[in-house]
């Protein structure tokens, strides 16, 4: 799998896809959606789709695809290579979302939470398959959040397609299992070949599973936190585990626009037009304070 685009710039997202098998342009197809790396505090999250004609579903099942979490890394690599060999009837596509993208989405002024990001990424991949000309008739999705709500949303988005959203879909439907293998192979490769742009001293890659409750992962985070700049971009700053370590290990930051003289928040809009005295002190901007400048009330 060629992840060179991500390796050149691992701050955003990248999409990869196989060639579309000609048979998938003609015959009705079944498509599965799954992800890898939703929970870890380290590394990217990868969403993947896999699809094949309904008439060849038994051939996909014959590959012995299974939930990627039940397979070893070598088994996943072997099955993905087999799907690549069977490219005359199996197609796939994936979206790799960097830790930096996830963190900036979740911590932005307008919050974009992980569920919304996941839903939109999955929807985008289904639309990508349709745009490529794949004749999608059925879609099976491993749920994020309530399956009923998610299914209703997807069904409204794709009214001409039969949509099924289930928990543990990767263990129930072979086409979702195949998607989970694609996603996991891509994430494993991205993590293994991650390019650290930061100049870290004594960098080690023994960070355990990457999950927040892994002691080895926590130890790696504490070792590689900078007291001023925080973590390298390999880390999802928006995870509570990372935030807790920043609070205990890094320097406190006081922003220029921090509330200082208005602990009760902004007053009512009418107060700006009334003659009554202000109940709290409004400090001028630092530029005026440093230069000893004050508002002139009498000329």
UniProtKB/Swiss-Prot annotation:
Residues 250-272 are annotated as: Disordered. Manganese or magnesium. Binds 1 divalent metal ion per monomer in the absence of substrate. May bind a second metal ion after substrate binding. The keyword Electron transport does not apply. It catalyses: Endonucleolytic cleavage to 5'-phosphomonoester. It is found in: Nucleus. NCBIfam families: ribonuclease HII. This is Ribonuclease H2 subunit A. It comes from Bos taurus (Bovine). The gene is RNASEH2A.
């Amino acid at each position: 799998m060629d992840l060179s685009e991500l390796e050149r710039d691992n701050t955003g997202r990248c999409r990869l896809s196989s060639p579309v098998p000609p048979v998938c342009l003609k015959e009705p197809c079944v498509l599965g959606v799954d992800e890898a790396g939703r929970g870890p505090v380290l590394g990217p999250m990868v969403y993947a789709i896999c699809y094949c004609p309904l008439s060849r579903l038994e051939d996909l099942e014959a590959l012995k695809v299974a939930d990627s979490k039940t397979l070893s890394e070598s088994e996943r690599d072997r099955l993905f290579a087999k799907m690549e060999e069977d490219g005359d009837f199996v197609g796939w596509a994936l979206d790799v979302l960097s830790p930096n993208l996830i963190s900036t989405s979740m911590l932005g002024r307008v919050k974009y939470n992980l569920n919304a990001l996941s839903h939109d990424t999955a929807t985008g991949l289904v639309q990508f398959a349709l745009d490529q000309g794949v004749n999608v008739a059925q879609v099976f999705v491993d749920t994020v959040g309530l399956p009923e709500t998610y299914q209703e949303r997807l069904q409204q988005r794709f009214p001409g397609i039969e949509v099924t959203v289930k928990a543990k879909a990767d263990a129930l439907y072979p086409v979702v299992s195949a998607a989970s293998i694609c996603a996991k192979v891509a994430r494993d490769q991205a993590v293994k070949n991650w390019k650290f742009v930061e100049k870290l001293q004594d960098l080690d890659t023994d960070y355990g599973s990457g999950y927040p409750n892994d002691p080895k992962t926590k130890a790696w985070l504490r070792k590689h936190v900078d007291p001023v700049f925080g973590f390298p971009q390999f880390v999802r700053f928006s995870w509570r585990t990372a935030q807790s370590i920043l609070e205990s290990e890094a320097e406190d930051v006081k922003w220029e626009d921090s509330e200082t003289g208005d602990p009760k928040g902004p007053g009512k809009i009418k107060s700006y037009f009334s003659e009554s005295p202000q109940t709290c002190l409004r400090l001028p901007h630092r530029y005026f304070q440093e230069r000893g400048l004050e508002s002139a009330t009498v000329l």
